[in-house]
A protein has these predicted regions:
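Middle-to-C-terminal accessory/interaction subdomains
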Residues: 1-120, 190, 194-205
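Solvent-exposed loop/turn segments flanking beta-strands in beta-repeat/beta-sandwich domains
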Residues: 113-134, 171
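Extracellular fibronectin type III
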Residues: 167-202
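Short beta-strand segments within Ig-like beta-sandwich modules, predominantly Fibronectin type-III
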Residues: 137-144
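Residue-level recognition of well-ordered beta-strand positions that form the cores
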Residues: 109-111, 126, 163
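Short strand-edge motifs at loop-to-beta-strand transitions and within beta-strands
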Residues: 146-150
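Beta-strand-rich modules
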Residues: 152-171
């Protein structure tokens, strides 16, 4: 959805219908029974070599874990299909803009979300001093337009989280993320308010 071309395609109902047909056709072909049979055939070829020297020294899984993973693979098709169906009932993700400081105010905006069912979408905004959002300094719910304004916080690090909610009550977070030692924390943007009242965005280069 973050790609402009894909957005244009997915906004077309006819395209989505054809996409559904193609996915269901592939899903029918990749049945659990068929995948299970194919996986067992590959296992008989691959596994004996994987757990012999020197390959076994680098194997990321034990033999038992390998068998468990192989046995679970056929179920992945149905699980992923259900996730795809569920995703179409939610608002689409979006990006949070870089806040702007104007006098003693901070203005925040973000891209519009999108509903495939043409539902009304409202937004909630939270600003916290920590990425776990345990120390929240600002919250606003039920916003109809993608922007909000608040008093410029004191100098420091802040995290912004915006969520979109449609009429069904389904929610969606923003594309943005913050990187910690534990990994990526999705749905938020990190900024810094400087001593002179300027706003700097946190930039992470992968």
């Amino acid at each position: 959805w973050g790609n402009v071309l894909f957005q244009r395609c997915l906004k077309s109902e006819r395209f989505r219908e054809k996409l559904d047909e193609a996915i269901l056709d592939l899903k029918e072909y990749l049945s659990e029974e068929r995948l299970g049979t194919m996986i067992e055939k590959y296992k008989t070829v691959v596994k004996p070599y994987l757990y012999e020297m020197p390959d076994v020294f680098y194997a990321p899984l034990t033999s038992e874990q390998y068998d468990e993973l192989a046995a679970s693979l056929p179920e992945e098709i149905e699980k992923n299909y259900q996730l795809y169906v569920e995703s179409l009932s939610k608002p689409m993700p979006f990006y949070i803009g870089v806040p702007v400081a104007e006098g003693n105010k901070m203005k925040i905006n973000w891209d519009n979300s999108y509903s495939f069912d043409a539902e009304d979408i409202t937004y909630s905004v939270e600003i916290a001093k920590d990425y776990l959002f345990q120390d929240v300094i600002y919250t606003q719910d039920g916003l109809l337009i993608p922007e909000t304004e608040l008093e410029l916080p004191e100098a420091g690090q802040y995290f912004i989280r915006v969520r979109a909610t449609n009429e069904k009550g389904k929610t969606q977070d923003a594309f943005d993320y913050y990187v910690t030692d534990e990994g990526k924390q999705y749905g938020m943007r990190c900024i810094y308010v400087t001593e002179d009242g300027q706003i700097e965005e946190d930039i992470y280069e992968e």
